[in-house]
Curated annotation (Swiss-Prot):
The gene is RPS0. Its main location: cytoplasm. Residues 208-219 have a biased composition (Basic and acidic residues). It comes from Pneumocystis carinii. This is Small ribosomal subunit protein uS2. Required for the assembly and/or stability of the 40S ribosomal subunit. Required for the processing of the 20S rRNA-precursor to mature 18S rRNA in a late step of the maturation of 40S ribosomal subunits. One of its GO terms (cellular component) is cytosolic small ribosomal subunit.
Amino acid sequence: MGILDAQPAADIEMLISANCHIGSRNCELRMEPYVFKRRADGVHIINLGKRWEKLILAARIIVTIENPTDIIAVSSRSYGQRAVHKYALHTGAREAISSRFTPGSFTNYITRSYKEPRLIIVTDPRTDSQAIKEASYVNIPVIALCDTDSPLQYVDVAIPTNNKGRHSIGLIWWMLAREVLRLRGTLANRDVEWGIMVDLYFYRDPEETEKDTESEQKALEASGNPAGQFGSVPVTSDWEIAAQSTGAGIITNVASNVQSVGNWDENFGVETGVPSDWAADSIQQSEIQHAQNWN
């Protein structure tokens, strides 16, 4: 039980700050062993010690898979889509199925999205029920992040946690990836900190990202230092002035030449003595040649 008692105090502080211990008002029968108590407002509190035990168990199961590409992370919930992609990137998993799960991905070999994983990890058994159901048909083990109201049917390992908050989901996926890397030997021991920040696993709203970008651009414009953005650099260099002056000179020269030439046909006829009507000239030459042939 040494490894179970070695939960760092910093991890406990992060779990509490991310509200990983806050469950829902409802509680499934098979989730009662993971509930610490029930508050006066009806919200169930999840036992963090039980969560740590299940997290270690899930990490050990993941490490037993020889080929990491045989593991698939699934998240139909938007708050977990960024987390599953980061988990697949850092642990070498085959891929992450985010957004909607395509029916038949595990059972219908005719579809292009057909896969044969040896293990799947889901964010929410309720939103990812299609993936869990298909995994049960082909005997694929399932690890799931389960809240107090999550159904545990066809779930082999349940990690009790709050699977509805953006911070709690990202933190649990980050801890799971860190523990997997430690068991594989990528990280020496628990005293060595992982260089990947937990913020990378958090969901980011696209609107908030756009607002941050706009605020940065406004700050650069206000400071008068546009070095951070190429698009904000005003093009007022000597090249533009030289190009404008050169272009103006060319236009002036062309206009003067046109005025000096005047009528092209008149000048052409005066200088060379050749009529400007090319069609009449060709007719006269043909008539002269025809008369010579008769003679």
